[in-house]
């Protein structure tokens, strides 16, 4: 008889465990101890199916979708006969049967199935659909001052190839430079561009905004931004702007007025003048040059709603990445979402959140996705710092996938470097092989992989400000890392399994060989990657759909891999990965 971990059995009618899809199907998930049960069934009925209720209930088999060291997460997807759903779970282990409902876990097949104690999905409203373009798209982050300079040099600029960097330095990157780089981005395989702030400021990062309705003249004009949007759209790309609405700069006119006039200013309550900090007002990160905004104030909230709407309507941007999202009044984000979806139904709203983001994502009334720092840290810890085993890495991945519905997992921004973090190659100790391995995984995992400008060239740099050196345009031609990223982006664009398919751990080897399955409605691919610092070999048991083939094709290198008796022998060099599929 198995030793069942009863305290691991868990289900709550919250969105990560129970939700509807945009197509109106229902997804149920159940947590159990790893390997504790041989079969799990969801019994589903209608809240109005009286008097029989569960006597003629739909019985839906559940399968293990995700697994970590200690847990299995079962999942089923079905179309309900009635959108007013009641359900419970039947769990089998050897000859023992248990039932789980809202009252708890019960022993025995004969336990009375009480409709009043069943879990309730009061009304299975279809979830809001994500913009199709955002699902699995390849993004590219630009820091405007450091990306590309076009036109006459402004006086006082730091030389582009300078070997020193500080946030107060200006290098003169501008919007005309980004426009000039559109063909480069298209050739690389970019489908969406995200730019850090562009508004008037006295810093190179522009997170201390002075005027939210004015493009910084060092970058260009509103007309330049409109032209950039038009050029990106003509070439099949989107533009996401950075909105800094948690705080402003000290030269923001309402803040200046409030600081000068005190309580006599109509803007006084746009900020927090409460002397909790030495400067006399609340700030972001205890930096006095970034006073915190009070978006609970209706006038302040309305101002920033107008800001968001203005740039969508005037320049046709495709959405906003919102800075320091968790520190902003949540009701403002609900208003902001309504504004975005009204101004541009295909627009997207991305949170900057460094932790578990369920509070901001699973309710469906705030953000579409977040910057997936939880995943980033797991990838860094395995591929760059080698702090965790492959088994631990796999467990972290499965737990992170369990946090959100699939429609959210498809659009989460997966990134390995940004303006706030050390560059990927630097994290990897300068080792291009591990940069290649980490980015291979990034591009073959669910979500929207984001390239930080210059990472595709193997640029180096530590934490802010050293991750913000100007783009090395002289290093593009013949760059093997650039070719690697370009290949990954184009393979991903042509593969529905990689863009929107499910993820399933397939094989985890102690030597660092990792196999995982990606599957969409019309394609299955098996990804193999060497996560170790030395070559690895192994024998991979192939999935049923591939086991009968004589040969499999690697989409990355376009080479054949022979199959023998449903098995595949493979040796991978450091940093190497393959994307296997049936030959056409």
Where do the model's predicted regions map?
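Active-site-proximal helices and loops of the catalytic beta/alpha 8
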Residues: 229-237, 252-259, 313, 323-407, ...
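Aromatic/acidic polysaccharide-binding cleft in carbohydrate-active enzymes
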Residues: 145, 363-364, 368, 410-432, ...
């Amino acid at each position: 008889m198995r030793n069942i971990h009863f305290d691991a059995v868990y289900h709550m009618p919250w969105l990560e465990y129970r939700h509807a899809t945009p197509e109106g199907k229902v997804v149920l998930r159940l947590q159990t101890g790893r390997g504790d049960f041989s079969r799990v069934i969801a019994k589903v009925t209608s809240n109005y199916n009286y008097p029989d209720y569960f006597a003629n209930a739909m019985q839906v088999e559940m399968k293990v979708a995700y697994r970590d060291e200690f847990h299995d997460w079962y999942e089923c997807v079905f179309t309900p006969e009635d959108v007013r759903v009641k359900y419970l779970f039947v769990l089998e282990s050897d000859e023992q049967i248990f039932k789980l409902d809202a009252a708890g876990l019960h022993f025995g097949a004969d336990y009375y199935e009480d409709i009043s104690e069943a879990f309730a999905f009061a009304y299975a409203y279809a979830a809001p659909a994500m913009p199709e373009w955002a699902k699995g798209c390849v993004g590219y982050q630009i820091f405007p001052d450091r990306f590309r300079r076009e036109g006459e040099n402004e006086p006082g600029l730091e030389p582009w190839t300078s070997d020193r960097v500080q946030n107060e330095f200006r290098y003169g990157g501008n919007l005309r430079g980004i426009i000039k780089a559109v063909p480069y981005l298209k050739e690389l395989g970019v489908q969406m561009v995200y730019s850090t702030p562009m508004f008037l400021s006295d810093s190179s990062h522009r997170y201390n905004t002075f005027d939210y309705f004015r493009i910084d003249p060092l970058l260009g004009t509103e007309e330049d931004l409109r032209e950039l949007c038009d050029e990106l759209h003509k070439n099949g790309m989107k533009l996401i702007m950075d909105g800094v609405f948690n705080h402003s700069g000290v030269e923001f006119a309402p803040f200046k007025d409030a600081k000068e006039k005190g309580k006599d200013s109509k803007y006084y309550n746009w900020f927090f003048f409460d002397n909790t900090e030495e400067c006399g007002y609340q700030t972001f990160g205890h930096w006095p040059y970034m006073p915190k905004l009070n978006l609970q104030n209706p006038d302040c909230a309305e101002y920033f709603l107008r800001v968001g709407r203005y740039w969508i309507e005037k320049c046709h941007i495709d959405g906003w990445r919102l800075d320091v999202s968790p520190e902003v009044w949540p009701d403002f984000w609900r208003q902001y979402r309504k504004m975005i979806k009204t101004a541009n139904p295909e627009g997207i709203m991305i949170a900057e959140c460094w932790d578990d983001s369920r509070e901001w994502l699973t309710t469906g009334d705030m953000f579409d996705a977040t910057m997936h720092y939880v995943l980033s840290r797991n990838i860094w810890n395995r591929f760059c710092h080698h702090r965790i085993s492959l088994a631990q890495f796999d467990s972290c991945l499965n737990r992170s996938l369990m946090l959100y519905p699939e429609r959210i997992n498809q659009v989460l921004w997966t990134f390995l470097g940004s303006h706030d973090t050390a560059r990927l190659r630097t994290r990897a100790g300068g080792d291009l092989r591990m940069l290649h391995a980490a980015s291979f995984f990034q591009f073959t995992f669910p979500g929207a992989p984001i390239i930080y400008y210059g990472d595709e060239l193997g640029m180096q740099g530590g934490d802010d400000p050293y991750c913000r050196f100007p783009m090395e345009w002289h290093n593009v031609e013949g760059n093997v890392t650039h070719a690697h990223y370009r290949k990954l982006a184009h393979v991903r664009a042509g593969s529905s399994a990689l863009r929107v398919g499910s993820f399933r751990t397939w094989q985890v080897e102690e030597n660092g060989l990792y196999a995982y399955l990606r599957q969409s409605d019309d394609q299955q691919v098996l990804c193999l990657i060497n996560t170790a610092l030395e070559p690895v070999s192994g024998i991979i048991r192939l999935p049923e759909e591939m086991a009968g083939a004589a040969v499999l094709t690697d989409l990355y290198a376009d080479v054949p891999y022979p199959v023998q008796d449903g098995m595949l022998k493979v040796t991978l060099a450091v940093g190497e990965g393959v994307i296997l599929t049936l030959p056409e």
